[in-house]
Regions:
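Short acidic/polar hinge/loop motifs at secondary-structure boundaries
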Residues: 1-20, 103
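Periplasmic-side early beta-strands and strand-to-turn transitions of outer-membrane beta-barrels
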Residues: 32, 45-47, 67-156, 186-189
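Face-selective signature of the C-terminal outer-membrane beta-barrel domain
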Residues: 106-124, 150-299, 374-382, 431, ...
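Structural signature of Gram-negative outer-membrane beta-barrels, strongest in the C-terminal barrel
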Residues: 120, 221-225, 231, 257-384, ...
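Surface-exposed extracellular loop regions of Gram-negative outer-membrane beta-barrel proteins
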Residues: 132-133, 138-139, 241-249, 314, ...
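Outer membrane beta-barrel strand-and-loop segments of large Gram-negative receptors
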Residues: 205, 209-215, 257-264, 268-270, ...
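Gram-negative outer-membrane beta-barrel transporters
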Residues: 277-278, 382-384, 405-492
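C-terminal beta-signal and adjacent terminal beta-strands/loops
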Residues: 386-387, 391, 438, 478, ...
Length: 608
C-alpha cells in the first residue's frame, strides 16, 4: 500500500521524542527523498514494575515496564483490535483486524557502554464482510454487492528487530547497529468472492533486510562536531504474481504471471560536520553520503548516488532565527519494481535502472517567545524529483498511482520521470502555559508529476491547502479537554475508462479501471473534520484511573470523493445485467460513497 491506515503500528505512549526533517536530512539517515521522521523510544523505569491497560471502543492495549536487573530495564506494549466487530455491527463491507507489539530493552553495564534492543511488529488481516450482501431486501444491497466485488482480501505481517551498542569516549562515541526487518504481503481475490472458485488475482511478496551500521561521532574544538560512518545491508526479495491486466492500447485483457526472487548487497558511507560560530549565533552544517546496490547493474556504482547537503541557522536578533538548507537526496527503487519479471528476466533491473533523486531548497524564519512558551515559524520549500519510475503500460508516474491501498510498481517501468513540489508552511505552537496548549499548522503546497505527454499535472497528493489545529486545556482535579480540527483541500482523481465496462473486463475485475489519458483531470471538494476528547483522571495510592470520551468527526462531515462507478444489476441476485443498447457492455450506475458518520468512543486507562 502507499498510505497507512487509521491506526499506526507504533504505540505513541512509548515514544519519547520525534525529530522530523522536512529538509537538511542528517547524512547518517539515507534512502529518503522528501522527509525523515526519527523516533526515539523512552527508556523503562528502573525502580519498579508498572502496568498500563487501555480498553477503548476499537482495541485493547497493555504496556508493562520495569527493571530486569540492577543496570537494565524493559518496556513493552501489545495491542489487539476488535474494530472489526464494530464495522460488522454497522454494516461496513470490510473488516480490518490488527495486532501489534513493541519493546525496548536497555542495559548500561558502566558509564562507557549502553546496549539497546528494540523490536516491533504487526499482523494485519483485511477480511470481507460477505454477510451484508446476503439479503436482497436491504436498501443498499446492490451497493454492497458492488463494493465487495471490487475489494481484495489482504494479509500482511512485518517485524523489525535490532540491537545498538553505544561506546562512549571522552571526545564522542562509537555506535554500532545491527538489525533485521521483514515484510510479508499477500493480496488475493476469488471469482465472486467464493473460495470454491479459482483465484482471479493472487499476489505474494516478501522483503527481508539485514543491516549493519558503524557510526563515529566526535566533539572537536571550537564548537565543532563531526560524524562519519559506513553501512552494509543484505536484502532478499521474492514475488509471485498471477492476474490479468487491461492493455490500454488494445483494450484486451492480458495475463500476467511470474515468480521472481533476487538477493542484493547495499552499501554506503557518510560524513557530516557541524560548527557553531559568532558566539553560537550561527550554526553551519555540511554533509555527504554515497550509496550503492547490486540489485541492478545501474545501481552498483556509489559515486553515481552522491548526496551532498548543507544547512545554516542564524540567530540575527533575540528570539529570531533564519534557517536555510539545500541538498540532493537519493532513494533506491522499491523492491516491487526491481523484482518485476517477464519470464526469467527482471526487466526493471538493467543498466538504465537508477536511484530516485530529489534536489531541494528550504528557507524560513522562526520566532521563539520562550517566556510564554510560544513559537512561530514560516518556511518555504521547493523539491525537484528526477528518475521517477514511469509505467511502461500506462505512461504515468507511479507517484500518481499511490493514493490508495493496493500494490504499486509490479510492472515494467522506465526511470525518466520528473516531478516537483513547492509551497510554504506556517506553524504556531503554544507549549503548556497556564494549562493551555495548542498547535496550528497551515501548508500551501503544489505537487506535480509529468503525464504521458511530458506535461506537469497535479499529483495524487496535491491537496494545495492543509490546515490542522490541535489544542486543549488541563483543568484542576484531573479534567482535560482536547480538540483537533483538520481542513484539507480536495485531492485530484482520474476518471474511469469507458472500456472497463465491457463484459469481459468487468466480469474479471469487478470494478472500473481508470482512464490515464485524463490523469488527475478531476478534483474532489475540500474536507474538514472536528474531533473532541474529554479525560477525567483519578489518582490513588498505587494506581490511577483515566476515563475518556471522544467523538471523531463531531460535525458529521462527509469525505468528498468521486462516485463509485458500478454497473446495472439484477435487484434480486445482484448479478450484472448486459446492456440492451450497447452489445458486449454493461450499463453504468453511480454509487455515492460519502460517509459522514459521527464516531463516539468511550474507554478507560488503568496505570498500576
Amino acid at each position: 500500500g502507499a498510505s497507512g491506515g487509521p491506526v499506526g503500528m507504533i504505540n505513541v505512549d512509548l515514544v519519547e521524542n520525534i525529530d522530523f526533517y522536512a529538509g537538511a536530512f542528517p547524512a547518517a539517515r539515507g534512502n529518503a527523498l522528501s522527509s525523515v521522521m526519527e523516533f526515539s523510544f523512552k527508556e523503562a523505569r528502573t525502580d519498579e514494575w508498572t502496568a498500563n491497560m487501555v480498553v477503548g471502543t476499537s482495541d485493547l492495549g497493555l504496556t508493562l515496564e520495569g527493571p530486569t536487573g540492577e543496570k537494565s530495564s524493559l518496556i513493552m506494549s501489545m495491542r489487539r483490535s476488535y474494530l472489526q466487530l464494530l464495522f460488522e455491527a454497522i454494516g461496513l463491507p470490510f473488516l480490518p483486524i490488527y495486532n501489534d507489539y513493541q519493546f525496548k530493552w536497555t542495559a548500561r553495564p558502566d558509564d562507557r557502554n549502553a546496549i539497546t534492543v528494540i523490536g516491533l511488529g504487526a499482523l494485519d488481516n483485511f477480511e470481507l464482510n460477505l454477510g451484508i450482501a446476503q439479503d436482497s431486501a436491504q436498501d443498499n444491497y446492490l451497493d454492497q454487492v458492488a463494493i465487495l466485488g471490487a475489494l481484495d482480501i489482504q494479509r500482511q505481517w512485518n517485524y523489525t528487530q535490532g540491537v545498538k551498542w553505544d561506546r562512549y569516549q571522552d571526545n564522542g562515541k562509537w555506535t554500532f547497529v545491527a538489525s533485521r526487518n521483514m515484510l510479508n504481503n499477500r493480496a488475493f481475490k476469488h471469482l465472486d468472492n467464493d473460495e470454491e472458485n479459482p483465484l482471479i488475482r493472487d499476489y505474494l511478496s516478501q522483503e527481508i533486510e539485514n543491516k549493519f551500521r558503524a557510526e563515529r561521532k566526535l566533539f572537536l574544538k571550537e564548537g565543532m562536531e563531526a560524524t562519519y560512518g559506513v553501512l552494509y545491508e543484505y536484502a532478499k526479495y521474492n514475488n509471485s504474481t498471477s492476474e490479468k491486466r487491461l492493455n490500454p492500447a488494445t483494450g484486451a485483457l492480458e495475463s500476467v504471471a511470474f515468480q521472481s526472487d533476487f538477493k542484493a548487497h547495499k552499501y554506503g558511507a557518510f560524513v557530516q560536520a557541524n560548527r557553531r560560530l559568532m558566539q553560537e549565533r550561527l550554526t553551519v552544517s555540511a554533509g555527504m553520503r554515497i550509496d550503492g546496490s547490486t540489485a541492478a547493474s545501474g545501481l552498483v556504482n556509489p559515486l553515481k548516488q552522491w548526496s551532498p547537503r548543507v544547512s545554516a541557522s542564524f540567530a540575527f536578533a533575540p528570539g529570531w532565527t533564519f534557517n536555510a538548507n539545500a541538498g540532493m537526496y537519493s532513494q533506491l527503487p522499491a523492491y516491487t519494481i526491481l523484482g518485476y519479471a517477464v519470464g526469467d528476466a527482471r526487466v526493471n533491473a538493467t543498466d538504465s535502472t537508477s536511484y530516485l533523486n530529489n534536489r531541494q531548497l528550504v528557507a524560513g524564519l522562526k520566532w521563539d517567545g520562550s517566556e510564554k512558551n510560544f513559537v512561530v515559524s514560516v518556511e518555504g520549500f521547493f523539491k525537484g524529483y528526477q528518475n521517477s519510475p514511469i509505467s511502461s503500460l500506462q505512461g504515468v508516474a507511479l507517484a500518481n498511482l499511490g493514493a490508495d491501498f493496493g500494490v504499486v510498481g509490479n510492472e515494467a517501468v522506465t526511470f525518466d520521470g520528473l516531478g516537483r513540489s513547492y509551497g510554504a508552511e506556517l506553524l504556531l505552537q503554544q507549549r503548556l502555559y497556564k494549562g493551555f496548549y495548542g498547535l496550528l499548522a497551515y501548508t500551501f503546497v503544489r505537487s506535480e508529476f509529468e503525464d504521458s505527454s511530458g506535461e506537469f499535472v497535479p499529483s495524487s497528493w496535491d491537496n494545495r491547502h492543509i490546515l490542522s489545529m490541535t489544542g486543549g486545556k488541563k483543568f484542576e482535579n484531573g479534567w482535560e479537554i482536547g480538540t483537533r480540527l483538520l481542513f484539507s483541500g480536495g485531492l485530484p482523481y482520474t476518471p474511469t475508462d469507458a472500456g472497463s465496462y465491457s463484459i469481459e473486463s468487468w466480469d474479471f475485475y469487478g470494478r472500473p479501471l481508470l482512464d490515464y489519458s485524463l490523469l488527475n483531470s478531476e478534483r474532489n471538494g475540500a474536507f474538514h473534520q472536528l474531533d473532541i476528547r474529554i479525560d477525567k483522571k483519578w489518582f490513588f495510592e498505587r494506581w490511577s484511573l483515566d476515563v475518556f470520551m471522544e467523538v471523531q468527526n463531531a460535525t458529521g462531515a462527509a469525505v468528498p470523493q468521486p462516485n463509485f462507478s458500478d454497473v446495472v444489476r439484477n435487484p434480486l441476485t445482484g448479478a450484472p445485467v448486459p446492456s440492451q443498447t450497447q452489445p458486449g457492455f454493461y450499463d453504468q450506475r453511480q454509487i455515492d460513497p460519502s460517509n459522514g458518520a459521527i464516531l463516539p468512543a468511550l474507554g478507560i486507562i488503568i496505570e498500576l
